[in-house]
Curated annotation (Swiss-Prot):
Keywords: Ribonucleoprotein, Ribosomal protein, RNA-binding, rRNA-binding. It comes from the Bacteria. SUPFAM superfamilies: Ribosomal proteins L15p and L18e (SSF52080). GO terms for cellular component: cytosolic large ribosomal subunit. Binds to the 23S rRNA. Residues 1-55 are annotated as: Disordered. Belongs to the universal ribosomal protein uL15 family. The gene is rplO. InterPro entries: Ribosomal_uL15, Ribosomal_uL15/eL18, Ribosomal_uL15/eL18_sf, Ribosomal_uL15_bac-type, Ribosomal_uL15_CS. GO terms for molecular function: rRNA binding; structural constituent of ribosome. Part of the 50S ribosomal subunit. Residues 23-35 have a biased composition (Gly residues). GO terms for biological process: translation. This is Large ribosomal subunit protein uL15.
Length: 147
């Protein structure tokens, strides 16, 4: 192979269709657009989604909002105020809260929220803490551990 004998692949260089150059050319007169109708007029084609004047599908269906998060993480939530009734020095986990009856069903990992007051020192192990809950547990002399 040399530069002087390079050639394009067969069928790679397709000729442009010359329309409106007489009937013998094959694309004369109506230029392949047929006889009459909207598709043969100038300014064609119609815009995408046009249904001939009928109310289009994208306007017939309602505007949907508030799609749920696909991979949303659900937590079993407990407020700090609910932990105030436990004895000082208690190890708080999801299992221990279910045993005591503070949590009735397991909805996922434990998350501690900051509503309520806490005066006893507790050792809390949970998957997540709000900033307020963390401050209240540590202010009461307790400790937190992320699981």
């Amino acid at each position: 192979m040399k530069l002087d004998n390079l050639a394009p692949q067969p069928g790679a260089k397709k000729r442009k269709r010359r329309v409106g150059r007489g009937i013998a050319a094959g694309q004369g007169a109506s230029c392949g657009f047929g006889m009459r109708g909207q598709k043969s007029r100038s300014g064609r084609p119609t815009r995408p989604g046009f249904e001939g004047g009928q109310m289009p599908l994208y306007r017939r269906v309602p505007k949907l909002k508030h799609f749920p998060l696909i991979n949303r993480k659900f937590y079993t939530v407990v407020n700090v105020g609910a932990l105030a009734g436990l004895a000082a020095g208690t190890e708080v986990t999801l299992e221990s809260l279910m045993a005591v009856g503070i949590v009735t069903q397991n909805d996922g990992p434990l998350k501690i929220l900051g509503d309520g007051e806490l005066s006893v020192s507790l050792s809390v192990s949970a998957a997540a803490f709000t900033a307020t809950a963390q401050q209240k547990i540590e202010a009461a002399g307790g400790s937190i551990a992320l699981v």
